[in-house]
């Protein structure tokens, strides 16, 4: 009876530790994913932005997947799963878009600085 109780307790502790380890690995993997984005801006103010559909067509024709295409301020921002996808998209768009556009790679910030910037109202001033 005592041996069976101790074996059950060890099994329960082992399974709990394994479950905790799996949860930590899953959390770490989720935090490690880093998005990348590409911003397309016209060089001159009187140049219009490229159409999102034509951008989609060029990327799709070359097998490049993306998360979203959204206009943001004076740019068209394309979000990707990885920096490799955005680098490949930059090469494709450099070839296919007419001159007059700046295509810039942008690595998205890490999660911790994003949360910190959301939590604080204004930057702290020392001195």
From Swiss-Prot:
Keyword annotations of the record: Cell inner membrane, Cell membrane, Membrane, Transmembrane, Transmembrane helix
GO MF: protein kinase binding
Highest taxon above the source species: Bacteria
InterPro entries: Modulator_MzrA, SecD-TM
Topology, Cytoplasmic side: 1-10
Membrane topology listed for this record: Single-pass membrane protein
Keyword Nucleotide-binding: no
GO cellular component entries: plasma membrane
Record field: transmembrane: 11-31
Stretches of the chain found on the membrane's Periplasmic side: 32-127
HAMAP family, A to Z: Modulator_MzrA (MF_00904)
Physiological role: Modulates the activity of the EnvZ/OmpR two-component regulatory system, probably by directly modulating EnvZ enzymatic activity and increasing stability of phosphorylated OmpR.
UniProt similarity note: Belongs to the MzrA family.
Quaternary structure (record): Interacts with EnvZ.
Protein name: Modulator protein MzrA
Gene giving rise to this polypeptide: mzrA
């Amino acid at each position: 009876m005592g041996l069976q109780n101790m074996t059950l307790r060890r099994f329960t502790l082992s399974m709990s530790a394994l479950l905790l380890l799996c949860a930590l690995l899953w959390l770490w993997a989720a935090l490690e994913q880093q998005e990348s984005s590409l911003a397309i801006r016209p060089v001159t103010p009187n140049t219009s932005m490229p159409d999102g559909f034509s951008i989609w067509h060029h990327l799709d024709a070359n097998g490049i997947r993306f998360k979203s295409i959204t206009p943001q301020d004076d740019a068209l921002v394309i979000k990707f799963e990885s920096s490799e996808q955005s680098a490949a998209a930059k090469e494709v768009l450099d070839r296919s878009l007419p001159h007059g556009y700046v295509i810039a790679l942008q690595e998205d910030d890490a999660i911790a600085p994003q949360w910190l910037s959301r939590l604080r109202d204004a930057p702290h001033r020392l001195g």
